[in-house]
């Protein structure tokens, strides 16, 4: 019955394609079948490469043509469907699902209660499929899914012109509705967008165009598929013929995926597979094809983001200085010269009826500030309003224009009247713009500091490298200095003392110590000799090294770290939603409050709600009310709220990276600061993860050198980790550098028990207790006592016998890390409970937990049981972090609120972990928790300041203190306060740059 059920289940998934037995169906299920039908796409969806840059055009035939060859690049979801009783039920479910757009295929198994759906996630979601099944009348639950993401890419855009959270929200919402976009995130602090998209539906250039249509300028940083891309500069004439020759020659090279030639910029962009070709090969082919007419070099590298940042700083500085040229005279004529008798008379001299020279002069001087220097605020306001949103620019434009145009109205009325005395606020609009420009200038300077960590990482790579040249016999015949970007895989690079390692690779000659602190955070130089790996960007301290390049360019560890930190700085913390929600209503609310403030004061003045003595001599009730209204409009600051979280996250992720703690974004930071329970794996986490010999007991009259010569000769052929540990230890007693051991004859290895061999005429056996007993060897009482003693200490005892007699016992252990006990103790002082979960036996587990000070231990746990323990703790209301090596701990790392992969080294792209600890140092666990807590303290203080500033500042600007103290906040002072609030938030976050990790023992 079971066999027939399985056959029916498999045949159900096989569909009606016919043919094939059960084994063929099984193979298809494992390999994800290629179904005969074409994927159906929405008719409105644009397909990349069809219909020009806009991506339009084409009917269903075009859409199907675009899908050819993409059948295997889909998402596969399996649903548990309950309630089906017959084939008709299965047929109705299958028919309903297949009717959805974006479904590749669907198969339903009525006996197993399963439905497998192959679909394109850009067009339909798992939730939509589940709802469709339920609409048919059955309960459905998603139980498994797999994505084949060859066509799913992530591109990054640098976006110019965003001034506040509202701008970022506008761009984000526009990107999220572009067909083919799965996810879009826009960060104001970094002025970048990260977009996950399906390249079959939309291109990176179309995404750039979508942003530019919102009124912002977008610069493509990376398309997601250009990890092996190079830009080459061409000196010489690029005509149609030479371009054709270059293209055909380059495309003939194995590994070349794409080539684009820009004759105007004299630039060639090539995408290639670094395993098959490299930049030097490409340059050589181009120059050879052009017969010497073209000279090719690496295109000057330029960081668009840094260039934009410097350009923005320069523009704001120039704008501010130019504004001062006009604003200072306006301020002097309205605030200072009016109190100097001689100057006052001259300024009050009438030129047209009641219009004075001073008023005319202020109008002339303030106009360039309002419309030329302040043009950026009009542009920003227009962009926001045209997309149905509002931002800080709207408030500034409204506030300054209200002051300016009322002043224009007032002096024009005076010019046409013989008795009207004008009152102008030209100094208000001019000084407002000047102070806001100053604030923006300081804010951009400060924001630039938040991304210094990435800039420093990128600067670690040396500009040049010394490449060794070999002859056909493998002898070094010369060396050549090349641009480090021209290094190809398998090149041999010479690294001199004090020089930087130019590429990831391994040492093929020489020995030295290398300072890796700038990459891993490891403070002590690491010894390197033949066979050891080195990391690009690290510093060689003493000896000369010859390094064979393995990972170059974007594949290097340094490039991976930079990408990870950049991605982390884009990821929003959940607490950021609070600021996003406020920003949606902030500006409209402030405008309403401003109007209500003006109306309340104006009506109170007209209805004699306050004494006339409250009104300054130079104003009337309307003008007093207007000043209060403008002050409310310009003091309100949504920018401080918008910058509170991302600036702190940016600095924290950069600081963490500099210490070898790679935090994957705001979500990880926010979860880590709540952790009150940490689950530790044992092997490789609390212990060093490598067995070492800790003790040797000789039971016969032998010297250690002779003893280990026999043992190593027997174990040298063993693949067991304990055998390797014994051989490594034996090298200490062996004088020959090559460590050539005596040849073993009649070698026999019994898996899990031991080895035996004939060495120099003696029968040598190395293994455990059972191996000796089954081999007929008597174990003396003294040896049995040692075995019991070692087991109690969680150490493995290896018995050595020669010629049927036990001659010694070797104790091997995976020792705990030197600071493990101190780390557990420190975590306890941080109110964090430590739990050990291991797959090892209870005896070893209890011994280790006792040694490090952990009270709660779970032993003999499989990987899935580790995850269950994490979930059990979470169900009890605990916030759980899991610390493991990222290999067999993946289920638990994923299940935990925060997964920390320790000892990752240069393998920083561990998907299961939220935080990657590059070193094997347990202190970094404390650093990760402590840094997250201090970061969120900063974030909370930022919010307290930003909210407190607005809650207190807006009422003061509205004149709440005026009745009792006659204190009022002039609009230009309110504007200065607004500018200062944003700067203060960024500066408060910048203090995280001076973070020092806790030191044990303090």
UniProtKB/Swiss-Prot annotation:
Residues 32-48 have a biased composition (Low complexity). It is an enzyme of class 7 (translocase). The keyword Protein transport does not apply. One of its GO terms (biological process) is transmembrane transport. Residues 32-63 are annotated as: Disordered. Its EC number is 7.2.2.8. Residues 49-60 have a biased composition (Gly residues). Induction: Weakly induced by high copper concentration. The keyword Lyase does not apply. Expressed in root pericycle cells, xylem region of diffuse vascular bundles in the first node, and vascular tissues of peduncle, rachis and husk. Cu(+) 1 binds at residues 86, 89. Keywords: ATP-binding, Cell membrane, Copper, Ion transport, Membrane, Metal-binding, Nucleotide-binding, Repeat, Translocase, Transmembrane, Transmembrane helix, Transport. GO terms for cellular component: plasma membrane. It is found in: Cell membrane. Pfam families: E1-E2_ATPase, HMA, Hydrolase. Disruption phenotype: Reduced grain yield. Increased levels of copper in roots. Decreased levels of copper in shoots and grains. It is a multi-pass membrane protein. Residues 75-141, 153-219, 228-294 form the HMA domain. The chain crosses the membrane at residues 320-340, 354-374, 392-412, 425-445, 585-605, 624-644, 943-963, 972-992. GO terms for molecular function: ATP binding; ATP hydrolysis activity; copper ion binding; P-type monovalent copper transporter activity. NCBIfam families: ATPase-IB_hvy, ATPase_P-type, copper ion binding protein. Belongs to the cation transport ATPase (P-type) (TC 3.A.3) family. Type IB subfamily. Copper (Cu) transporter that plays an essential role in promoting translocation of Cu from roots to shoots. Involved in loading Cu to the xylem of the roots and other organs, including panicles. This is Copper-transporting ATPase HMA5. It comes from Oryza sativa subsp. japonica. The gene is HMA5.
């Amino acid at each position: 019955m079971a066999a027939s059920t399985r056959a029916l289940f498999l045949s159900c998934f096989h569909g009606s394609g016919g043919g094939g037995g059960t084994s063929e169906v099984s193979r298809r299920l494992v390999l994800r079948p290629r179904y005969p039908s074409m994927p159906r796409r929405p008719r409105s969806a644009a397909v990349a490469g069809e219909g020009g840059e806009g991506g339009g055009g084409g009917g269903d035939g075009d859409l199907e043509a675009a899908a050819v060859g993409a059948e295997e690049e889909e998402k596969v979801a399996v649903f548990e469907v309950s309630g089906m009783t017959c084939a008709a039920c299965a047929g109705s479910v299958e028919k309903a699902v297949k009717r959805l757009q974006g479904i590749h295929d669907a198969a339903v198994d009525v006996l197993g209660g399963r439905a497998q759906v192959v679909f394109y996630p850009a067009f339909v979601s798992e939730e939509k499929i589940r709802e469709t099944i339920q609409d048919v009348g059955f309960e459905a639950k998603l139980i498994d899914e797999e994505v084949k993401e060859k066509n799913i890419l992530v591109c990054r855009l640098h976006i110019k012109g965003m001034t506040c959270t509202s701008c970022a929200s506008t761009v984000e919402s526009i990107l999220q509705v572009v067909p083919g976009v799965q996810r879009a995130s826009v960060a104001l602090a970094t002025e970048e967008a990260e977009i996950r998209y399906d390249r079959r539906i939309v291109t990176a250039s179309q995404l750039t165009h979508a942003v530019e249509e919102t009124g912002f300028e977008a610069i493509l940083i990376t398309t997601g598929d250009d990890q092996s891309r190079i830009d080459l500069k061409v000196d010489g004439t690029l005509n149609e013929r030479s371009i054709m020759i270059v293209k055909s020659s380059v495309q003939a090279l194995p590994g070349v995926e794409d080539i684009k030639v820009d004759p105007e910029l004299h630039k060639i962009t090539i995408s290639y597979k670094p395993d098959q070709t490299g930049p030097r090969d490409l340059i050589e082919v181009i120059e050879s094809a052009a017969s010497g007419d073209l000279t090719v070099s690496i295109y000057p590298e330029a960081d668009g983001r840094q260039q934009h940042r410097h350009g923005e700083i320069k523009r704001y500085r120039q704008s501010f200085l130019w504004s001062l040229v006009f604003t200072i005279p306006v301020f002097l004529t309205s605030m200072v010269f009016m109190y100097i008798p001689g100057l006052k008379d001259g300024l009050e001299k009438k030129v047209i009826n009641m219009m004075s020279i001073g008023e005319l002069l202020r109008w002339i001087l303030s106009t360039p500030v309002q419309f030329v220097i302040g043009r950026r605020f009009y542009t920003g306001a227009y962009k926001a309003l045209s997309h149905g949103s509002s931002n800080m620019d709207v408030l500034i434009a409204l506030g300054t224009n209200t002051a300016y145009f009322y002043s224009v109205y007032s002096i024009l009325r005076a010019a046409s009247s013989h008795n009207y005395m004008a009152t102008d606020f030209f100094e208000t609009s001019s000084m407002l713009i000047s102070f806001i420009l100053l604030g923006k200038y300081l804010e951009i300077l400060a924001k630039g500091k938040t991304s210094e960590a990435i800039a420093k990482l990128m600067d670690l790579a040396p500009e040049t490298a010394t490449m060794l040249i070999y002859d056909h016999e493998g002898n070094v015949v010369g060396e050549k200095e090349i641009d480090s970007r021209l290094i190809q895989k398998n090149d041999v690079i010479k690294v001199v003392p004090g020089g930087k390692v130019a590429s990831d690779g391994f040492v093929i000659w020489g020995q030295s110590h290398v300072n890796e602190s700038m990459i891993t955070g490891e403070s002590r130089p690491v010894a390197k000799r033949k066979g050891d790996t080195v990391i690009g960007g690290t510093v060689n301290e003493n000896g000369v090294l010859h390094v064979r390049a393995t990972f170059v360019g974007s594949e290097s560890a340094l490039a991976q770290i930079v990408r990870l930190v950049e991605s982390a700085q884009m990821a929003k913390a959940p607490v950021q939603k609070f600021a996003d929600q406020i920003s949606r209503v902030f500006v409209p609310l402030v405008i309403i409050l401003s109007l209500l403030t003006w109306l309340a004061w104006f009506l109170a003045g007209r209805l004699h709600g306050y004494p006339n003595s409250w009104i300054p001599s130079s104003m009337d009730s309307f003008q007093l009310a207007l000043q209060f209204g403008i002050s409310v409009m310009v003091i309100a600051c949504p920018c401080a709220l918008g910058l509170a979280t991302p600036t702190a996250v940016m600095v924290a992720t950069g600081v963490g990276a500099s210490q070898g703690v790679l935090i994957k974004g705001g979500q990880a930071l926010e979860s880590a600061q709540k952790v009150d329970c940490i689950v530790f794996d044992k092997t490789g986490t609390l212990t060093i993860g490598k067995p070492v010999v800790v003790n040797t007991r000789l039971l016969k009259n032998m010297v250690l050198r002779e003893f280990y010569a026999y043992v190593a000769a027997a174990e040298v052929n063993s693949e067991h980790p304990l055998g390797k540990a014994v051989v490594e230890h034996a090298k200490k007693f062996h004088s020959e550098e090559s460590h050539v051991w005596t040849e073993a004859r009649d070698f026999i290895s019994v898996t899990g028990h031991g080895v035996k061999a004939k060495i120099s005429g003696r029968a040598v056996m190395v293994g455990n207790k059972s191996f000796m007993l089954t081999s007929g060897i008597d174990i003396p009482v003294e040896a049995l006592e040692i075995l019991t003693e070692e087991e109690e200490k969680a150490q493995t005892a290896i018995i050595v016998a020669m010629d049927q007699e036990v001659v010694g016992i070797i104790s091997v252990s995976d020792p705990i890390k030197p600071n493990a006990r101190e780390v557990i103790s420190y975590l306890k002082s941080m109110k964090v409970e430590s739990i050990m979960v291991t797959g090892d036996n209870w005896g070893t587990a209890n011994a280790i937990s006792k040694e490090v000070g952990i009270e709660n231990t779970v032993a003999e746990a499989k990987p899935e049981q580790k995850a269950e323990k994490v979930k059990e703790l979470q169900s009890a209301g605990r916030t759980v972090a899991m610390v493991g090596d990222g290999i067999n701990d993946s289920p638990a790392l994923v299940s935990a609120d925060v997964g920390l992969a320790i000892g990752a080294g240069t393998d920083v792209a561990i998907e299961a972990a939220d935080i990657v600890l590059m070193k094997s140092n347990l202190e970094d666990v404390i650093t990760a928790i402590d840094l997250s807590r201090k970061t969120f303290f900063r974030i909370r203080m930022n919010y307290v300041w930003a909210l407190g500033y607005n809650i207190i500042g807006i009422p003061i600007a509205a004149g709440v203190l005026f009745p009792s103290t006659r204190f009022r906040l002039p609009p230009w002072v309110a504007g200065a306060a607004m500018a200062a609030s944003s700067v203060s938030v960024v500066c408060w976050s910048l203090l995280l740059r001076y973070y020092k990790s806790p030191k044990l023992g303090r």
